[in-house]
């Protein structure tokens, strides 16, 4: 028995003794409770709420299972905007804003996406990063479907490895001032 094997045997025994009284953790599913709505009559907050709600109105719950089966997930609103998708796939657009949907319910995720689109249009940000994660694949399957229904989404594609790979999406959002001049992306 050489020095190295003796050292590993001793450290292995010590490690087992140290973990002797531990028990295995049980991973449970977390159930979220409904959030109680506040009665807020402030006109500015109501306006912001209605804008965000208007954007989340486009997201329906119907599920078309055949729509986004290809991997990686990608979408363009119109074939004339194919150059935008091509540049997005090549990684030429860097997102200026990011949102993480981990741990949210479907309704909360829709509200968060509506808030993201509202913020992007107000701040004139055209590229966003949406992190939906893996989990039980509910948000992973629904997020591309919801985004494809929104009229202000120009294109989206699975994020590069640096931004989360298949657990995230990079989105190009149409800004109101860009509706007149869409050639900014060429």
Swiss-Prot record:
Belongs to the SmrB family. Associates with collided ribosomes, but not with correctly translating polysomes. Keywords: Endonuclease, Hydrolase, Nuclease, RNA-binding, rRNA-binding. GO terms for biological process: rescue of stalled ribosome. This is Ribosome rescue factor SmrB. One of its GO terms (molecular function) is rRNA binding. Acts as a ribosome collision sensor. Detects stalled/collided disomes (pairs of ribosomes where the leading ribosome is stalled and a second ribosome has collided with it) and endonucleolytically cleaves mRNA at the 5' boundary of the stalled ribosome. Stalled/collided disomes form a new interface (primarily via the 30S subunits) that binds SmrB. Cleaved mRNA becomes available for tmRNA ligation, leading to ribosomal subunit dissociation and rescue of stalled ribosomes. Its EC number is 3.1.-.-. The keyword Transferase does not apply. HAMAP family: SmrB. Residues 99-174 form the Smr domain. Gene3D superfamilies: 3.30.1370.110. The keyword Acyltransferase does not apply. The gene is smrB. Pfam families: Smr. It comes from the Bacteria.
């Amino acid at each position: 028995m050489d020095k190295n094997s003796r050292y590993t045997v001793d450290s292995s025994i010590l490690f087992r003794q140290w973990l002797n009284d531990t028990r295995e953790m049980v991973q449970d599913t977390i159930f979220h409770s409904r959030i109680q709505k506040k009665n807020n009559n402030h006109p500015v907050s109501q306006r912001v709420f209605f804008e965000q709600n208007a954007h989340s109105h486009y997201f329906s719950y119907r599920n078309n299972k055949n729509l986004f089966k290809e991997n990686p997930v990608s979408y363009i609103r119109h074939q004339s905007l194919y150059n935008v998708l091509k540049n997005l796939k090549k990684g030429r657009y860097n997102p200026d804003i990011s949102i993480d949907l981990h741990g949210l319910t479907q309704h909360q995720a829709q509200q968060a996406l509506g808030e993201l689109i509202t913020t992007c249009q107000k701040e004139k940000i055209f590229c966003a990063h949406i992190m939906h994660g893996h989990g039980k694949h509910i948000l992973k399957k629904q997020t591309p479907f919801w985004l494809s229904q929104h009229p202000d989404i120009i294109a989206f594609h699975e994020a590069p490895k640096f931004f989360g790979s298949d657990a995230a999406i990079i989105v190009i959002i149409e800004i109101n001032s860009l509706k007149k001049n869409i050639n900014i992306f060429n």
